[in-house]
């Protein structure tokens, strides 16, 4: 079938089961082919092909609300809602988003990117439906990994208490990104093998009612003994105890089983949970046989061999450099413990986990718990290393402030994917952490210019005993600079001059250092001499150097691959104002006050005006404005 001809999901409503199976095969071939060129979340989407088709067959989108948790498994939904022709642009600049996008389609009723939000959103939609007196079905689809998130469990508790009408689809593939962990995962494992509880209960009730004279009384007695029956038939009965009608387990690749259970769910009053078992990566053997999460989300790959297309050469990956440096130090410091919220592969912690299995904790999608777990460890003299993406640290803000920084505990936050991340777009750009961290008392915040300085910062962080410390670092590979064999501490709060100059000053750090140096080279050819400072400590700043620079009366330009509001440039302005440099010329470049969508990092930087050429032009505009201090 030519999938680009699909304009509306109603097309699946008239298909026979054999036709639906053929459509599934066509979609899998399409995804494998398209994603081999663009990259994307291949594993999750290959696993939900039949489930997505069945949902669109039984429900009437967009009237009925299909809400995709996390959203990376929405590609099949996009195909069935008329967007197959755009898949060549998937996750590309100005192209199709890799997540549900309300501006893209009326069928995308909720935008996601972070996990565990679907149930709360669904409940809000269901309450609005009931208050307005409409009759649409509300259907959140949540994975077993996302169900480990505290927000999802909070919503389950509230939905069950309110007896809200909705149909929750639990897509259980035994993995989130990496293999799942935790007691809830073990409960689901028992449910997978327990048989269809709801069907057995209903059949028993019908059988008892057929017994002459006493059947009705026996059925009533059985209903009163429902709890005993549940515990006999199903190990755990977790969802029934929360107030849900539990259906399953259902074969997520069998249309008859799926459609039968979805039809039954539509008849049930109150919240229903349909437990669907799927195989992540189904239909493409490299993804289907993946046990660690390599094929969860990928770059381009070769279909025939299942090998990834190599990107341009560079240094070691930043995640790998940080984790391996921690591992190296941990060999001589038994206090070091690693923690990750469900990202052991992305954070390159496999080696640490293999060498120190009793000192490595993957807590699942539980950023708040991960942070306070680290705080608890620190109270007992341990040195917790929390590997967490910038975008996910947002979810643990109160714990950072209240549990770690307020108590001045020695926690090392390794903030991965800081800055623009590219193809994952606005839900994953790591551009807010400076603004939400720099004002928190007791916290040290730093970012290295290259991987050699990065390894020394890791060492500095793990040697630091005066409170919490955080190191930001970008996605991808380093610059390929030589690495010192011996690790050394960097004095806290010190900057360094990378290039001297007499006409203007650039203050920057991290990934924008190379941009500043390139701009300085361009300006030198025009006779403009620019000093470039590596402002590697964002907090505390190098106040002695900052005084010296302000006393020089040179115009200052700050550059950051982060939001301007409340960022590093703002801290420099505040310092100048607070210390009486009221005539200082200070301008800022960074991320504007809007969410940055998907595209390559270079394309996004060009769009927002953050390149070496833009920096050189900006320096030229502030040169005539040099003024003396008041």
From Swiss-Prot:
* Domain of life assignment: Bacteria
In its UniProt record, which GO terms are filed under biological process? 1-deoxy-D-xylulose 5-phosphate biosynthetic process; isopentenyl diphosphate biosynthetic process, methylerythritol 4-phosphate pathway; terpenoid biosynthetic process; thiamine biosynthetic process
Residues the entry annotates as binding thiamine diphosphate? 72, 113-115, 145-146, 173, 284, 367
Annotated Gene3D superfamilies: 3.40.50.920, 3.40.50.970
Task: Tell me the leader sequence span.
Answer: none
> If you read the UniProt record, what top EC class would you report for this enzyme, in one word?
transferase
**Is Transmembrane helix found in the keyword set?**
no
Which controlled-vocabulary keywords does the entry list?
A: Isoprene biosynthesis, Magnesium, Metal-binding, Thiamine biosynthesis, Thiamine pyrophosphate, Transferase
Q: Which SMART domains match?
A: Transket_pyr
Task: List positions binding Mg(2+).
Answer: 144, 173
What are this entry's molecular-function GO terms?
1-deoxy-D-xylulose-5-phosphate synthase activity; magnesium ion binding; thiamine pyrophosphate binding
According to its UniProt record, the EC number is 2.2.1.7
Q: In which pathway does it act?
A: Metabolic intermediate biosynthesis; 1-deoxy-D-xylulose 5-phosphate biosynthesis; 1-deoxy-D-xylulose 5-phosphate from D-glyceraldehyde 3-phosphate and pyruvate: step 1/1
Q: Can you supply one Gene Ontology CC term for this chain's record?
A: cytosol
Q: Which cofactor does it need?
A: Mg(2+); thiamine diphosphate
Task: State a single Pfam family of this protein.
Answer: Transketolase_C
Q: Is the keyword Cell inner membrane assigned to this protein? A: no
Family matches, as InterPro entries:
Dxylulose-5-P_synthase, THDP-binding, Transketo_C/PFOR_II, Transketolase-like_Pyr-bd, Transketolase_BS, Transketolase_C, Transketolase_CS
Cofactor note from UniProt? Binds 1 Mg(2+) ion per subunit.
Reaction(s) catalyzed by this protein?
A: D-glyceraldehyde 3-phosphate + pyruvate + H(+) = 1-deoxy-D-xylulose 5-phosphate + CO2
Q: Which residues cross the membrane?
A: none
Which family, according to the similarity comment?
Belongs to the transketolase family. DXPS subfamily.
Q: How does it assemble?
A: Homodimer.
Which purpose does this protein serve, as stated in its record?
Answer: Catalyzes the acyloin condensation reaction between C atoms 2 and 3 of pyruvate and glyceraldehyde 3-phosphate to yield 1-deoxy-D-xylulose-5-phosphate (DXP).
Q: What is this protein called?
A: 1-deoxy-D-xylulose-5-phosphate synthase
Origin species, per record, is Geobacillus thermodenitrificans (strain NG80-2)
Tell me the lineage of the source organism: Bacteria, Bacillati, Bacillota, Bacilli, Bacillales
Question: Quick one: which gene encodes this?
Answer: dxs
């Amino acid at each position: 079938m030519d999938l680009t001809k699909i304009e509306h999901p109603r097309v699946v409503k008239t298909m026979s089961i054999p036709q639906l199976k053929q459509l599934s095969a066509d979609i899998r071939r399409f995804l494998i082919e398209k994603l081999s060129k663009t990259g994307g979340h291949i594993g999750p989407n290959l696993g939900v092909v039949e489930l997505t088709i069945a949902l669109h067959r039984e429900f009437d989108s967009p009237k009925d609300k299909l809400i995709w948790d996390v959203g990376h498994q929405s590609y099949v939904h996009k195909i069935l809602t008329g967007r197959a022709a755009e898949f060549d642009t998937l996750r590309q600049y100005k192209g199709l988003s890799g997540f549900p996008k309300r501006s893209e389609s009326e069928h995308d009723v909720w935008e996601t990117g972070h996990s565990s939000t679907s149930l709360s959103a669904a409940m809000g939609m269901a309450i609005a439906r009931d208050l307005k007196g409409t009759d649409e079905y509300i259907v959140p689809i949540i994975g077993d990994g996302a169900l480990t998130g505290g927000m999802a469990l909070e919503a389950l508790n509230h939905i069950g208490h309110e007896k809200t009408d909705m149909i929750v689809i639990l897509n259980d593939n035994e993995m989130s990104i990496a293999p799942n962990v935790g007691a809830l995962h073990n409960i689901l494992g028992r449910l997978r093998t327990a048989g269809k509880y709801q069907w057995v209960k209903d059949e028993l009730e019908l059988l008892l009612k057929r017994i002459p004279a006493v059947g009705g009384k026996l059925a009533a007695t059985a209903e009163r003994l429902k709890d005993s029956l549940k515990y006999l038939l199903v190990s755990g009965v977790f969802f029934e105890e929360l107030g849900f009608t539990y259906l399953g387990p259902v074969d997520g690749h069998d249309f008859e089983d799926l459609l039968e259970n979805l039809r039954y769910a539509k008849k049930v009053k109150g919240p229903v949970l349909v437990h669907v078992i799927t195989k992540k990566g189904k239909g493409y053997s490299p993804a289907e046989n993946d046990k660690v999460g390599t094929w969860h989300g990928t770059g381009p790959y070769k279909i025939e061999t299942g090998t990834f297309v190599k990107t341009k050469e560079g240094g070691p990956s930043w995640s790998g450099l940080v984790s391996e440096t921690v591992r190296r130090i941990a060999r001589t410091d038994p206090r070091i413990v690693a923690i990750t919220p469900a990202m052991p592969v992305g954070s390159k912690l496999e080696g640490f986990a293999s060498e120190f299995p009793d000192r490595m904790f993957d807590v699942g999608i539980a950023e708040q718990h991960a942070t306070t777990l680290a705080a608890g460890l620190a109270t007992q003299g341990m040195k917790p290393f929390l590997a967490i993406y910038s975008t996910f640290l947002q979810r643990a803000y109160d714990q950072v402030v209240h549990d770690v920084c307020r108590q001045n505990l020695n926690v090392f936050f390794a903030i991965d994917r800081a800055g623009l991340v590219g193809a994952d777009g606005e839900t994953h750009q790591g551009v807010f952490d400076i603004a939400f961290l720099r004002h928190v008392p007791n916290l040290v915040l730093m970012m290295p210019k290259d991987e050699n300085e990065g390894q020394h910062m890791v060492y500095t962080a793990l040697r630091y005993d005066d409170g919490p410390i955080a190191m930001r670092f970008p996605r991808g590979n380093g610059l390929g600079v030589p690495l010192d064999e011996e690790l050394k501490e960097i004095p806290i709060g010190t900057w360094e001059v990378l290039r001297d100059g007499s006409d203007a000053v650039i203050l920057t750090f991290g990934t924008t250092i190379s941009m500043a140096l390139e701009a300085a080279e361009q300006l030198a050819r025009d006779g403009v001499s620019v000093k470039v400072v590596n402002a590697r400590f964002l907090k505390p700043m190098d106040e002695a150097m900052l005084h010296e620079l302000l006393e020089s009366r040179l115009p200052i330009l700050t550059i950051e691959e982060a939001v301007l509001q409340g960022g590093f440039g703002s801290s420099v302005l505040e310092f100048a104002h607070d210390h009486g440099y009221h005539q200082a010329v200070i301008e800022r470049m960074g991320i504007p006050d809007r969410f940055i969508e998907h595209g390559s990092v270079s394309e996004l930087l060009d769009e927002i005006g953050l390149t070496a050429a833009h920096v050189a032009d900006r320096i030229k505009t502030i040169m005539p404005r040099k003024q003396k201090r008041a």
